[in-house]
């Protein structure tokens, strides 16, 4: 079973632990989410809890969004996401709120976000290729290089100029350093995908017990 919450990336800072260790953390605003819909295996083919985060003015939302929010007795939301096979309580129902207290300090989580978009970029910036000689006699400066000996064909996976960033990425096994229930904030060790003020999804780690299980097997 999975527990999760939606949030907004605020930025990065650093905190000291009780041992005096300086830890870089990402601050994530997890203002209580509203349960917009509860999906069941019988009605929808899978079980999930749909959460809504960050209020949006009704002027900026269409009629279906307003009607969907009205069923949960709340305002339209900017960010809506699903938590599959959610473990948020047996009596969870539409209109309930999910807050930061579902997590505890020391837990590991997986954070999913959208990376920064860089637009159309060349190979040097996008893929980290080396440039050619910059002398006047050189005809190769910042080109992608040879496409191979076969004419009229580009091999699959060839690194060429194109769009960079703006992809959905998940960083796994990040530790929660602090849970601030009063301010609805999570402090997560390390960095997470996306720019400041971008939306993220936080779920309990799928690999939380991998190292422990492997160590037990090796000891046997």
UniProtKB/Swiss-Prot annotation:
Q: Which gene encodes it?
A: rplC
| Top-level lineage group | Bacteria
What's the protein here called? Large ribosomal subunit protein uL3
Arranged from A to Z, the UniProt key words for this protein are: Ribonucleoprotein, Ribosomal protein, RNA-binding, rRNA-binding
Give me the ranges of the annotated region Disordered. 113-143
A GO CC annotation given for this chain = cytosolic large ribosomal subunit
Decide whether keyword Ribosomal protein is in the record.
Answer: yes
Family stated for the protein in its record: Belongs to the universal ribosomal protein uL3 family.
Q: Which GO molecular function terms does the record list? A: rRNA binding; structural constituent of ribosome
Report the function annotation for this chain. One of the primary rRNA binding proteins, it binds directly near the 3'-end of the 23S rRNA, where it nucleates assembly of the 50S subunit.
* Assembly mode: Part of the 50S ribosomal subunit. Forms a cluster with proteins L14 and L19.
One GO process term, biological-process aspect: translation
């Amino acid at each position: 079973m999975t527990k999760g919450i939606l949030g907004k990336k605020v930025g990065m800072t650093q905190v000291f632990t009780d041992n005096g260790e300086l830890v870089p953390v990402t601050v994530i605003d997890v203002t209580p989410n509203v349960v917009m819909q509860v999906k069941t295996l019988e009605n929808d083919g899978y079980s999930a809890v749909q959460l809504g985060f960050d209020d949006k003015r009704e002027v900026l939302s269409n009629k279906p969004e307003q009607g969907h929010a009205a069923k949960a007795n709340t305002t339209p939301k900017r960010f809506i996401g699903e938590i599959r096979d959610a473990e948020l309580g047996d009596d969870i129902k539409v209109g309930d709120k999910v807050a930061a207290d579902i997590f505890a300090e020391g837990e590991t989580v997986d954070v999913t976000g959208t990376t920064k978009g860089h637009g159309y970029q060349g190979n040097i910036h996008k893929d980290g290729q080396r440039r050619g000689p910059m002398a006047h006699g050189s005809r190769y400066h910042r080109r992608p290089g040879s496409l191979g000996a076969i004419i009229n064909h580009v091999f699959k996976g060839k690194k060429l100029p194109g769009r960079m960033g703006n992809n959905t990425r998940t960083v796994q096994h990040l530790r929660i350093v602090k849970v601030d229930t009063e301010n609805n904030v999570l402090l997560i060790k390390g960095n997470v995908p996306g720019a400041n003020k971008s939306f993220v999804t936080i779920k309990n780690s799928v690999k939380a017990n991998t190292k422990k299980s492997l160590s037990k097997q090796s000891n046997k």
